């Protein structure tokens, strides 16, 4: 049986749920599919089918970003249910780097929690341009405590504005009640999706640039070969195009023999779309997450660069102490993280939390790098800085 062909008749948007652990991100994702399935715009996905990798089930906590698709009357959405647990912020970075906007889920009973703040900060660092807030679990607050919800809203608006997200719409509701079929709360989820439609603009995709896709995952399909998945950052890829695999080792050439999106075949993949590419003659061990697949010779692997970096303050979740030349944190680019050695500018003895500084970095492995590219710097499970590559040295 041949696969269905993907229909491209609406603008395609990538969004995701972010926020503190147990505030209801995955429940909301399921509730959105439930609310839209009533209009024939989504297939209902229950909580357990979204929260679906083995290590997640055991802890009841989402680890890998899970992709769900649905439509509103105006758009087609690919929705990433992003990790909420502190150990897995790494995946949040790679999941968030692909969002055109995010739904920040906050429990009305708790208000903003440490991870709420970290996720807003990370969203800003990795370039998520717009946020819509879903204030969840309002059904658990009694009438006499209703003004608490107003306080939580005010606090959230201030927090978002501080990080550069001004005037974010806030929708109140209960994901669980919507999931259980309560008509009033299903209406709230529709209201949320209307706010997403209205407040997260369709981005201009970089269709005309040379094709590039950071690889998120690699699968082996028996009898067909190796599939790499990810979100196309720019350009167009067609079946039978020659491409290169760049980064984390020697550059390899291959040919694209298939393009798929949500298990449907496509003649081509375009900038902004999450796709799987079937590659000819590439074994599962020849390719890994963190490489990019791109138009031949459009990007080169590098290890050394100059960068403009902002080092987070202690209050923003950053380091408490300065660092010196020879510091070795992890650098996160697109879907990869690599240890790098930092050299401070001449005459600078140390870098304090809160500083803006120019750093020379040498990575211990090659990565497909370009000038102007953004990255996060992490150490011991927390983000300590964010930067942009100003010049490639080698």
UniProtKB/Swiss-Prot annotation:
Residues 174-176 are annotated as: G5. Residues 19-26 are annotated as: G1. It is an enzyme of class 3 (hydrolase). Residues 81-84 are annotated as: G3. InterPro entries: EF-Tu_GTP-bd, EF-Tu_GTPase, EFTu-like_2, EFTU_2, G_TR_CS, P-loop_NTPase, Small_GTP-bd, T_Tr_GTP-bd_dom. PROSITE patterns: G_TR_1 (PS00301), G_TR_2 (PS51722). The keyword Nucleotide-binding applies. Residues 10-204 form the tr-type G domain. Residues 136-139 are annotated as: G4. GTP binds at residues 19-26, 81-85, 136-139. Coiled coil: none annotated. Monomer. GTP hydrolase that promotes the GTP-dependent binding of aminoacyl-tRNA to the A-site of ribosomes during protein biosynthesis. This is Elongation factor Tu. It comes from Chlamydia pneumoniae (Chlamydophila pneumoniae).
């Amino acid at each position: 049986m041949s696969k269905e062909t993907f229909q491209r008749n609406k603008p395609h948007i990538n969004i995701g749920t972010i926020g503190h652990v147990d505030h209801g991100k995955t429940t909301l994702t399921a509730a959105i599919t439930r609310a839209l399935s009533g209009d024939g715009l989504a297939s209902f996905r229950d909580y357990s089918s979204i929260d679906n990798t083995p290590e997640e089930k055991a802890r009841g906590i989402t680890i890998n970003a899970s992709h769900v698709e649905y439509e509103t009357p105006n758009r087609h959405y690919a929705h990433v249910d992003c990790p909420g647990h502190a150990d897995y912020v790494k995946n949040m970075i790679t999941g968030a780097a692909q969002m055109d906007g995010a739904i920040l889920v906050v429990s009305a009973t708790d208000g903003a929690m440490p991870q709420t703040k970290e996720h807003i900060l990370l969203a800003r660092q990795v370039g998520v341009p717009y946020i819509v807030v879903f204030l969840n679990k309002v059904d658990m607050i009694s009438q006499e405590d209703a003004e608490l919800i107003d306080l939580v809203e005010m606090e959230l608006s201030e927090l978002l504005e501080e990080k550069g997200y001004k005037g974010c719409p806030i929708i109140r509701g209960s994901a669980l009640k919507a999931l259980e079929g309560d008509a009033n709360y299903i209406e709230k989820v529709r209201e949320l999706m209307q706010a997403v439609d209205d407040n997260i603009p369709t981005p201009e995709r970089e269709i005309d640039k040379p094709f590039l896709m950071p690889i998120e995952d690699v699968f082996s399909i028996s009898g067909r070969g190796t599939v790499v998945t990810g979100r196309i950052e720019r350009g167009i890829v067609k079946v039978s195009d020659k491409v290169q695999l760049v980064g984390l080792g020697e550059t390899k050439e291959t040919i694209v023999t298939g393009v798929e999106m949500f298990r449907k075949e496509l003649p081509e993949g375009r900038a902004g779309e999450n796709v799987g590419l079937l590659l000819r003659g590439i074994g599962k061990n020849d390719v890994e997450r963190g490489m990019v697949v791109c138009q031949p010779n459009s990007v080169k692997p590098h290890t050394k660069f100059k960068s403009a970096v902002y080092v987070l303050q202690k209050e923003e979740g950053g380091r408490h102490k300065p660092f010196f030349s020879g510091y070795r944190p992890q650098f996160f680019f697109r879907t990869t993280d690599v240890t790098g050695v930092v050299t401070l500018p001449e005459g600078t003895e140390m870098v304090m939390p809160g500083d803006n500084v120019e750093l020379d970095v040498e990575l211990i492995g090659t990565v497909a790098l370009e000038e102007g590219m953004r990255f996060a710097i992490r150490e011991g499970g927390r983000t300590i800085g964010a930067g942009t590559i100003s010049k490639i040295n080698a």
